[in-house]
Swiss-Prot record:
Belongs to the SpoVG family. InterPro entries: SpoVG, SpoVG_sf. This is Putative septation protein SpoVG. One of its GO terms (biological process) is division septum assembly. Keywords: Cell cycle, Cell division, Septation. Could be involved in septation. The lineage of its organism: Bacteria, Bacillati, Bacillota, Clostridia, Eubacteriales. Pfam families: SpoVG. Gene3D superfamilies: Stage V sporulation protein G. It comes from Clostridium botulinum (strain Eklund 17B / Type B). NCBIfam families: PRK13259.1.
Length: 92
């Protein structure tokens, strides 16, 4: 499965959540609401989730193979860095 599009839908400079992203696979399947989060060890992604009645968050969709997760994260963080760079250029 190939990542064919990454769309940074919302960018925030405040708080730990830095962006909300949609990723398209093979021009056929899209996953919305992936979050870019700033943690203690740098940026990472959080897959879309919902809150259970007990207050726990459960992923709605997520990769089950570590290599796939790393590939998705690398693509998203690369697109996020590019979007931030373009935003900085526009502000100058």
């Amino acid at each position: 499965m190939q990542i064919t599009d990454v769309r940074i839908r919302k960018i925030s400079s405040e708080g730990k959540m830095k962006a909300i992203v949609s990723v398209t696979f093979d021009n056929e399947f899209v996953v919305h609401d992936i979050k870019v989060i700033e943690g203690q060890n740098g940026l990472f992604i959080a897959m879309p989730s919902r809150k259970t009645p007990t207050g726990e968050f459960k992923d709605i969709a997520h990769p089950i193979v570590m290599d796939s997760r790393e590939k998705i994260q690398n693509e998203i963080l690369s697109a996020y860095a590019k979007a931030i760079e373009e935003q900085d250029v526009e502000e100058e």
